[in-house]
């Protein structure tokens, strides 16, 4: 049985919005990892575009150890590199791109050291280009138009001047590239996953449902139980959003490449659309990229960054993510603490009298851009991360009971975590404690808004769950005599009981 006391469990004090932190040279050492957890990190992102397998293995081992020592169920997100198209080596490493200057992009460099000869990692890119298309470099800071092309080459003319360096990114927003969603490197990285285990695998540059299906086949082939996070960063993914969300287990609003692939003025609206669609489908959504970007080199964020995090929480994101701020920044711990503080302020407004008495009240089914009220029913047989319709109905009733009775705590007994996920989408003001006998499910709940998970060796009968939760919460000073606790029991394997709801008054 889990320890009866756990000083790290603070459901009444911790922010409900989950925080994802990307690890790198500035943060992967055990001492900093521990400080990040104390500051509020719930999910650690391992970026497989950088670092070796040995480095990732050591980092993962440190995360697991800290999780055990702190009593926190920490989720790990493995972010696959995907088919990111980059420049090859440039003679001198950097070249100025003056307005009107011409460059040749080819699969292979000809003899000589002319910096106006460019190569890229995707050898058939030039075959996918058309005359008149715009090619973007270095996150869109440099643009060139295709003025001529032939087998294996394309002539480009600079329309947006700037500077490019070796290995910087290339984007072609209007091109339908034939590159596969999973690269050979990704498959090797999945072999690592099969040996070590993570809770989430991020798929980069998703364009269509088939990309997710392919990854799921590779996970199944390797017997990997990880949930799939579809990263929305291509215009094709936005066009196929509802189908992608229906197949994925979670979604990331990857605003970096998304802001290059579509006009930056559209990004806020698309962000709201993605979040609303994920709520409709009852899956977690992460808002990512440049949220506190200035904190890579400053101990305080800009006012605009604070507003960005605040409004993402009000939009309904389940999690907010830090990238360079924690991976390579000078203030990784301060970045997490700042993000937590901003999220707390947003949640205070979310549950304030002002917000509740607004012209329209907060509701996952009443969110602007959700394409209609209600949500799509999921199949009667669902994946681990999917919410069943009957489960959704029970937790909706439980949320209403919590509000009516001003409950002190909502306890969810679940095996797969579906019931806890459904509860998180209700956005309860009541703290939620999830009990599960599945360690991987407990860790995965690190991404679920407002849910604090505990791993226990077995799920008991409803009466035993009640007694266990009562004793545990008393030992941690979470409830007192006269408090009401609402208990929801999900579907338990090999148990004839279905979803159940009861109210317990603490004696």
Regions flagged by a language model, labelled:
Residues 1-507:
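Non-catalytic helical/linker scaffolds that mediate oligomerization, partner binding
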